Structure formats: C-alpha cells, structure tokens
C-alpha cells in the first residue's frame, strides 16, 4: 500500500495518524486518527478519486457538546487541500454503538442536509468540495436553503 497523501497535512494540523489494520492483524486497511472522542480510519483510492471511510468509532464516553462530525470535516479538509475538490468521501452509514439515532435517520441526514448521494443501499458519496461545517449547515437549514 502506498504512503497516504493526507497524513502530512493532518499531522501539520495537530493530529497523530497511525496505521489501521483488520482486527489487529498485519492486514492494512488504511490510516486512522482520533478527534473529538472518535476514531476515524480511511484509505485514499487515487484511481476512484475517493477517500474511503473505513471506520468511525467512539473511543470516549459521550461528554458534553462535541461535534460528532468534526473528524469527518477534518478529513474532508485534508482531502480538499491535498487531493483537490473533485475527490469524494465514500462510506457505509451506520450509527455509533449506543447512539439514540437510527441508521435510517442518519442516512436521511446525509441525503437531505449534506447533499450526499446514496450509490447503493447504505453506501454514500459526497464531494469534498461540498462539505461544510455543522454551524454553516444549521444556518442553511434555518434560512430554508437545505
């Protein structure tokens, strides 16, 4: 597997990245970092022009009002800065363990408020140039633009 092109940018922005493997085996699935109580693992697929989100997992108990999308936003910023605006975030939507949010409701959120496309059941793709902050998303919603 080639060196991940996003790691230098993420490191420059204060994140510690490490290899992500299949259940602790030597089989590499990509790279990972932790932010705002979540672990996010991904791999870049240059030929498909996408950043495949391999895993989003809660690593800390829910405390306070942390933005659950901060890690995704950081990954999208890295992809946009390093790879360009025509790359896509790609992954399967499933709720975090212990969440009161249903998978269907989360999928609706991705379709309605982020503009993500559902390529097949549960599999979403969103152009990195379309990713906006949660506060901007709420402003759009409040102004009737979403």
Curated annotation (Swiss-Prot):
Record-linked InterPro entries: LcrR/CesD2, T3SS_LcrR
Lineage top rank: taxon: Bacteria
Disulphides: none
Record key words, sorted: Calcium, Plasmid
A Pfam family the protein falls into: LcrR
Function: Involved in the down-regulation of lcrGVH transcription in the presence or absence of calcium and is necessary for lcrG protein expression in the absence of calcium. Plays an important role in the regulation of the low-calcium response.
Protein name: Low calcium response locus protein R
